[in-house]
From Swiss-Prot:
Keywords of this entry: Hydrolase, Lipid A biosynthesis, Lipid biosynthesis, Lipid metabolism, Metal-binding, Zinc
A Pfam short name: LpxC
UniProt protein name: UDP-3-O-acyl-N-acetylglucosamine deacetylase
Domain of life: Bacteria
A GO cellular component entry from the record: membrane
Cofactor annotation: Zn(2+)
Length: 307
């Protein structure tokens, strides 16, 4: 299977979830083996240089997965666009933006899916590399845990826990094996969510200024405030899976393995990536030149060429 990039550059504007400011974002094709990179067009000199994404650049995970370079350049809320790039198997792209955070759009990854569909996807000459999990790796902290286990495909199982009536109406656990299920159908539409009391607290600290009922599920003491309700009965846990897929794709390769988590979040997801990369016996970088050897979970990438 070959690496892929965008067929053409494409732009979109939106609002930053935390700044509330307008953000102009452009995705560009990139050369093979270059990976996913970001560039802040509003910064000059060294501050405006291209940033090659790695798990070691995620240095702020308080509210999202945020790049913070050693020069202090920030690119926040990257998990939704990374999740969409993962769904289309984009190995190489340059993402330019004129603000410190990716626009929140509607709170899901679906607008970025549409953006990729409009841009089109093209195969490149180099072979795609996958990160194959060879042995179990687990991180536990403060009542939360995440783990990778070997698996011939890509499967995600997550459980959330919130003592709240809105969450008690659906299962707290969702499992998706991408050998038989579609990311676009099952995951992409799930929106980020937050509690009204948290929104008020964040705004008191000049955060969450761009959040509203058009780009997030907002919950009061008893119920969902969005008049249209939920897009899936279990939209909350599905969004956590959307986030996790984006967080994991920061490693730069599709993962051949199973990911499980209980009360997972950006910090512990990133810690798991770092733990895997720190143990050379835990993973291998593999290629599938023969499509017959490709795990079923990735066959959809072979036919999803929207160019």
């Amino acid at each position: 299977m070959l690496q892929r990039t965008l067929a053409k550059s494409i732009s979109v504007t939106g609002v930053g979830l935390h700044s509330g400011e307008r953000v102009a974002l452009t995705l560009h094709p990139a050369p093979e083996n270059s990976g996913i990179s970001f560039r802040r067009t509003d910064l000059d000199g060294e501050m405006g240089e291209q940033i090659k994404l790695t798990p070691y650049l995620i240095n702020d995970t308080r509210l999202s997965s945020t790049i913070v370079t050693d020069k202090g350049v920030r690119v926040g809320t990257i998990e939704h666009i990374m999740s969409a790039l993962s769904a289309y198997g984009i190995d190489n792209a340059l993402i330019e933006l004129n603000a410190p955070e990716i626009p929140i759009m509607d709170g899901s990854s679906l607008p970025f899916i549409y953006l990729l569909q409009d841009a089109g996807v093209v195969d490149q000459k180099a072979q795609k590399r996958f990160l194959k999990i060879l042995k179990p790796v687990e991180i536990k902290e403060a009542g939360k845990w995440v783990r990778f286990t070997p698996y011939d495909g890509f499967k995600v199982t997550l459980t959330i826990e919130f003592d709240h009536p809105a969450f008690n109406r659906s299962s707290p656990t969702f499992e998706i094996d991408f050998a038989g299920k579609s990311y676009i159908d099952e995951i992409a539409r799930a929106r980020t969510f937050g509690f009204m009391h948290e929104v008020e607290m964040m705004r008191a600290h000049n955060l969450g200024l761009g959040g509203n009922l058009n780009n997030a599920i907002v919950i009061d003491d008893t119920d969902v405030l969005n008049p249209e309700g939920l897009r899936y009965p279990d939209e909350f846990v599905r969004h956590k899976i959307l986030d996790a897929i984006g967080d994991l794709y920061i490693v730069g390769h599709p993962i051949v393995g199973a990911f499980e988590g209980y009360k997972s979040g950006h910090a512990i997801n990133n810690a798991l990536l770092r733990a895997v990369l720190a143990d050379e016996t835990a993973y291998d970088r593999v290629e599938f030149a023969d499509s017959d050897d490709l795990p079923d979970a990735f066959h959809e990438l072979n036919i999803r060429n929207c160019g």
